Amino acid sequence: SLGSVAVPIGDTAAVIWNAMWGLELPQGISRTIILGVRLPRVLATALCGGALALCGAAMQGLLRNPLADGSTLGVSAGASLGAVTALLLGISFPGLPFAGTMVMAMLFAMGSLILILSLSYSADRGMSTQTIILMGVVFSMFATSIISLLTAFSGEKLRSITFWTMGSLSGAGYTETLVLLGALAVFGGVLLSCADELNAFSLGEDAARHMGVAVGPVKLGVLVCVASLIGVCVSVGGSIGFVGLIVPHAARLFTGASHRRLLPLTLFMG
């Protein structure tokens, strides 16, 4: 495997295979590098990519917009604002140094969603897709400007904030991987179960309502799941773009427009 320390592919495969089946692990530095550093990074990267891609596919189906992803709703920018705030204020929990960033990112993601939906409802009682997108874009620009302002006054925290905003999973461990896995199992499972409803949304909200879909609750449920997943991913890996936008379109080349096949393949490709 590639990295600052070269480990032969055979050694990498042997370490992972023996660890999976409880066999005696090879001695040497390669065991520590593979199991302690690189394996959790790879797992976290796979889970984060799959979650972001799944969120993008769900958003594109819900909003009927091929350019939609997590950033369209403004949730990604809100989660980034929460994480930057945690880094700037040094918020942490004993024994879990990353938990402060994660909690703040999730809280700001949910708060952003509530604010965007509230503004959308006040402007349009029907909460049309166009209104939600418009409010999301406006809030995303506002949150990005606040992040720039906080970065300018961050002082000694400038390096850590700048490095985090670039997006990196180099610090991911097994704890972060388990959190990602749990979030993906819960919220991703809900999104996968909404495949038929998203197929109905692709025909328009009125058509979906006539087909028996509870438009309001389904829309709210999908948005909450997307916001939660993005909050977790942003807190672990920083602001990562284009995955939720590009991967769903690549998956459609193989599955077509049916979300019953699109969502699982998007999750796998991500």
Which sequence ranges carry the predicted segments?
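Alpha-helical transmembrane segments in inner-membrane proteins
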Residues: S1-G270
